[in-house]
Amino acid sequence: MKNVTKYKRQYFMPPVKCMKWTEKEYVDKAPIWCSVDLRDGNQALVIPMSLEQKVEFFKLLVEIGFKEIEVGFPAASETEYTFIRTLIEQNLIPDDVTIQVLTQAREHIIRKTFEAVKGAPKAIVHVYNSTSVAQREQVFKKSKEEILKIAVDGATLLKELADQTEGNFQFEYSPESFTGTEPEYALEVCNAVLDVWKPTADNKAIINLPVTVQHSMPHVYASQVEYMCENLKYRENVIVSLHPHNDRGCGVADSEMGLLAGADRIEGTLFGNGERTGNVDIVTLAMNMFSQGVDSELDFSNMPHVCEVYEECAGMKVDERSPYSGALVFAAFSGSHQDAIAKGMHWREEKDPSRWTVPYLPIDPTDVGRNYDADVIRINSQSGKGGVGYILETKYGLNLPPKMREAMGYAAKAVSDHSHKELHPDEIFNLFKSTFENIVEPYSINEVHFQQKDGGITTQVTSTFNGKTITTEATGNGRLDAVSNALRKAYEMKFTLVTYQEHALEKSTSSKAIAYVGIQKPDGTLAWGAGVNPDIIRASIDALVTAINNR
């Protein structure tokens, strides 16, 4: 690509080395979660949500378990203001949920904000102003001192109006464009704001460190966060919050590393909706913790429902590959993957049902409301014996011999390849029946009689081939062997009986049985058949005839 020289790094490393966070292995407890779907997410929609959609979305967030929910920028529009008043006046805010409202550090906007939250049981008032080099120089054309004064004046007005307004308020400050701000200067501004608020153990302040635009790799942000955490005043009474965006695709990594670096709180959205490439996806963050055995304190056990409400309200589509939530994230089309999953599921069932270590599946799909049959093993032209066999076994109770699974896998692959489509379980089952079960052309058996004689079995078989019926007598070590010998004798066939397997299809005295028979042809290849009948002897004979017809 051309013109690479016009770009330069726009981030700043802390003045001292801040890498203690690298000593931690994983995030071991859930942060305070704050959904910003109804503000940051909503403002990024082509068609913002209506009042009714916002109320429905708010109820979804409460259902998931969010205890802090940003509900709007009251001064931005009448819809935003009305929505906030609706929540308050209709008592839609649960006792254990705190709403959050956003305001710029401008007097008339701050005053409008406090009007909107009057009477709220409790609310976080989030004030911000931009502090980055680019914003100072290009947008506001102000010095560091002037930018700091904007922050302090805004913080002062928040404190004054909180004392004058009905309600219980907590304060939050963001140095917007934190990642493009010199860390020392961001610290100076935040500490000046904290000096105004003087947070206490009973009324902590929130300092939010937004990745307004991603400029760096995640480890840089983590170092910036660690620097702030170690140098903020009143640290024991300050909640350090993160608000990552996803411009470089690192929103989740920024958040996880930022938590390792000492942050206490995350602001984000469901499925990463937000300006440009979006905010950090809280679903992914929470489920990452869950997959490591850490309680995220959010409930995504009915992910299909969450996706449905999100898509209806936001008008956005959850991507099919979106981690943990997409329609295809548990799907295995590859034959080797399917085989490993099927074996892993059997191993878990037999060895350790209490733990989840199944290959290729980072979590149990049923933990998020998905199921194995429809969501995991999916059959197309890339699939193989493992997936086809797993579907036939788990959904239809057919436990095929290994080599027969292979033959059935090739049959399914051929159909999918020819039709250029995925095969659904019922199509696979029907393919099995039409290919391997009770096939009576060109050979069929009309009648069989057995007699035990001289330690062996003698049989009299009446069979039909191309409309001609003959009766043949033969002996064998068992019934199936005797019938095999009779058919060889009648039609001068050459084959060897190499595989026989049977099992009940249902657990009852009147259930049908299925038998599988594999025969080896003179060229060494195998042909397969299955027979289904309440009489296992008849089922095995039908399986043999089908295998012969499949030669």
What residues fall within each predicted segment?
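N-terminal capping/small domains of soluble enzymes
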Residues: M1-E107, N371, V376-I379, S383, ...
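A mid-to-C-terminal "edge-of-domain" accessory segment
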Residues: K2-R39, G293-E473, T509-I514
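Alpha/beta enzyme core
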Residues: Y7, W33, I47-E68, I84-Q90, ...
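Short, small-residue-enriched loops and turns at beta-alpha junctions
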Residues: D40, A44, P74-E78, S132-A134, ...
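Short beta-alpha connecting loops at secondary-structure transitions
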Residues: L209-V211, E267-E275, M287-D299, N371-I377, ...
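Catalytic alpha/beta core domains of metabolic enzymes, predominantly
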Residues: S216-K351
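Generic long, charged, amphipathic alpha-helical segments
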Residues: M493-T525
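Mixed-charge, glycine-accented linear interaction segment located at domain edges/termini
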Residues: T525-W528, V532-R551
